């Protein structure tokens, strides 16, 4: 995962990200779809993107807050837009077209409700704060603002990755219909993401002509 830069949506341009030069701590806030089941059932207190941004600003008043909205919200297909007041007060900058893997090496923290990006960030060595109760919280790997009481024992990151990606799921090659290993899937997704990025770049160049 670290080597190939594969993420959940496997979309967004993979290119260098230039962090802000204001000297402040860089906090990445990852948006989700408001009303999503994972928020309704897994985030008992903070339940919208706007509430998340206000909470993060209150918790990190001096930080540079970088907000990445959910791709479906950016496309206008799902709920989760942020008011102008919240954007002005809570957000220092936004990123819309870059993949998360371009951002992870540069951020000091990632804050989210229940997004899978928190798990990805842990794998990439980023400090993660959860405002909900996703599966990767409560094991001593994240800072949890609203922890799940039933999770009491620490778990090494390697164990969490193994249980999440190897022991629990089964993978099928969507091209052949045959079983495949997690490593095979990662390589295939990486190749697909690279191909999609090249196609997008060609389309963007054509539009500029």
Where do the language-model regions lie?
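Catalytic-core helical/loop segments in enzymes performing group transfer/polymerization on anionic/lipid-linked
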Residues: 1-209
